[in-house]
């Protein structure tokens, strides 16, 4: 998979931010992990969820990945404009993660699996890289 099905328009970026903002209390009221955690955000897109979850965990480190460099650039800009400094954005494919097994304390993904050709395989690949548990919202 190498393209986001809804495209990369400004309209879509605004829709994603509106969606994240309107559901943040419902989805992320408990998205708080232990200080010092290393968290993988798989399929971060434009950073719509990142801007909500990373500030709640300012003493943890996020590695937020996506396959789209354009989306990652937007995510970096959103993080910078919100003074979010605990996130490293990286181009990576969920099916070919460049990290050691059990590297992450937690993994979270939101609105990602429905875009995968094989979501079970995606979860299996992610499972190799986690020590604790992961959260996903689809």
PLM regions with names:
Residues 120-135:
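A short glycine-rich, Lys/Arg-flanked "PGG" loop and its adjoining helix->strand segment in the class I
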Residues 40, 46-96, 121:
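Class I SAM-dependent methyltransferase SAM/SAH-binding core
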Residues 105-119:
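A short SAM/SAH-binding and catalytic strip from SAM-dependent methyltransferases
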Residues 95-106:
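A short acidic, Gly/Pro-enriched loop at the edge of an enzyme's catalytic core
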Residues 38, 61, 133-135:
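Short glycine-centered segments of the SAM/dcSAM-binding site in methyltransferase folds
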Residues 2-21:
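Class I SAM-dependent methyltransferase Rossmann-like catalytic core
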Residues 18-37, 52:
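Conserved alpha-helix/loop element of class I SAM-dependent methyltransferases that forms part
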Residues 33, 57, 116, 130-131:
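A generic alpha-to-beta junction signature in SAM-dependent methyltransferases
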């Amino acid at each position: 998979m190498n393209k986001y099905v809804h495209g990369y328009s400004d309209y879509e970026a605004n829709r994603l931010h509106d969606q994240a903002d309107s559901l943040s209390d419902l989805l992320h009221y408990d998205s708080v992990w232990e200080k010092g955690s290393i968290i993988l955000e798989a399929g971060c897109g434009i950073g719509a969820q990142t801007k909500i979850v990373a500030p709640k965990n300012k003493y943890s480190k996020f590695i937020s990945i996506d396959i789209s460099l354009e989306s990652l650039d937007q995510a970096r800009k959103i993080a910078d404009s919100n003074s979010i400094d605990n996130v490293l954005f990286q181009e990576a494919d969920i099916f070919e993660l460049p990290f050691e097994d059990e590297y992450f304390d937690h993994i979270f993904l939101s609105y990602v699996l429905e875009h995968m050709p094989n979501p079970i395989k995606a979860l299996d690949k992610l499972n190799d890289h986690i020590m604790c548990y992961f959260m996903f919202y689809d």
